[in-house]
Amino acid sequence: MASKDSDVRCVKCQSLKPTTPLTGQDRCARCVAINELKPWISTCNINPCYDGDLSESNETIEMMDINSCREDTPSDAESETRFMPFVAHSKQPKHTSKNPTKGEIQYFPVEKCKDIHRVENQSSIDEEGKQCWICRDGESLPEARYCNCYGDLQYCHEECLKTWISMSGEKKCKFCQTPYKVNRQLSLKRGLPGYWDRDDRFVFIAGFIGMGTILAGWIASFFYLLVVLCGKYFTYKDVMIVVGGLAIIQVVGLMFSLFMYFQIGNLLRQYINYMTETNIDPLRT
């Protein structure tokens, strides 16, 4: 028959455990240990009615505490997503409460401002005003518009546009691709371009003198041939003089043409462009 002490049950877990006679406790050693750790256990949300071995109770409590802390800790991916820098342009969702409870963390979606470049451009336009898109000068801008561009690209000086067309060779707007109404007219009122140096002027003038000399030789040979052929008497020597003269003029003219092409061809094109007056009719006003 079991002794009286062995029949005593723990008032907490009802296990057959003898009480401690010195202190008079009516709980087993396991329940006494749990009771001492009760404040710490309550913070970790651990069930105090653990049926495991007493020797493993402390380790089990520690493992449960670690697992509970891991559940409350956000993952790396969530932390990277949530803790993104807050942008001034981001908007707060409508479903979020205005007065969050204490300890509650609210995360707001980060939205990139799509119109930041447009806003900056618009502010610069408002500050600087109207400007020519070629020279960036806002003085004496004409009211005429030469293409279908709007905004800051519609303003342009006529002289700036003429220079741009002559230098680039384009005959339409590079933004809206609208063809310019360009009228070219050759004018002999201008002299040599002022941006030519002394060497350019000398080569250009010498080239025209050479062309005039060749043309004069052709004309003289032609009239001499007419005089010889129309005469009643002409010798073989007269015919050879005419043929030889024409051959020499032909060779000299060919060589001079090559010289003109390689030496003053660029100068001749510059002179033609300089002598040509370019007028651009406005597309709208």
UniProtKB/Swiss-Prot annotation:
Q: Which reaction does it catalyse?
A: S-ubiquitinyl-[E2 ubiquitin-conjugating enzyme]-L-cysteine + [acceptor protein]-L-lysine = [E2 ubiquitin-conjugating enzyme]-L-cysteine + N(6)-ubiquitinyl-[acceptor protein]-L-lysine
- Tell me what organism the protein belongs to: Bovine herpesvirus 4 (strain DN-599) (BoHV-4)
List, alphabetically, the GO terms of the cellular component aspect.
Answer: membrane
Query: For Zn(2+) 2, which residues are the binding ones?
Result: C147, C149, C173, C176
Residues in the Cytoplasmic compartment per record: 1-201, 260-285
User: Hey, which stretches end up on the Extracellular side?
Assistant: 223-238
> What is the protein's known function?
Controls the expression of later classes of genes and also of the IE genes (Potential). E3 ubiquitin-protein ligase. E3 ubiquitin ligases accept ubiquitin from an E2 ubiquitin-conjugating enzyme in the form of a thioester and then directly transfer the ubiquitin to targeted substrates.
Q: Pathway, per Swiss-Prot/TrEMBL?
A: Protein modification; protein ubiquitination
Please give, as recorded in its UniProt entry, the membrane topology of this protein. Multi-pass membrane protein
Amino acids binding Zn(2+) 1: C132, C135, H157, C160
- This one is known as Probable E3 ubiquitin-protein ligase IE1
| Pfam families, A to Z | RINGv (PF12906)
Lineage start: Viruses, Duplodnaviria, Heunggongvirae, Peploviricota, Herviviricetes
Q: What Gene3D superfamilies would the database entry show?
A: Zinc/RING finger domain, C3HC4 (zinc finger)
Report TM segments.
202-222, 239-259
Q: What does the entry's domain section say?
A: The RING-CH-type zinc finger domain is required for E3 ligase activity.
Q: Which GO terms describe its molecular function?
A: DNA binding; transferase activity; zinc ion binding
The enzyme's first-digit EC class, named in words, is: transferase
Example GO biological process? protein ubiquitination
Tell me which EC number(s) this protein carries: 2.3.2.27
Keywords attached to this Swiss-Prot or TrEMBL record, sorted alphabetically, are: DNA-binding, Early protein, Membrane, Metal-binding, Transcription, Transcription regulation, Transferase, Transmembrane, Transmembrane helix, Ubl conjugation pathway, Zinc, Zinc-finger
- Major localisation: membrane
- Renumbered zinc finger spans (RING-CH-type): 124-183
Q: What PANTHER family does the database record attribute to this sequence?
A: E3 UBIQUITIN-PROTEIN LIGASE MARCH 2/3 FAMILY MEMBER (PTHR46065), FI20425P1 (PTHR46065:SF3)
Q: Where in the cell is it found?
A: Membrane
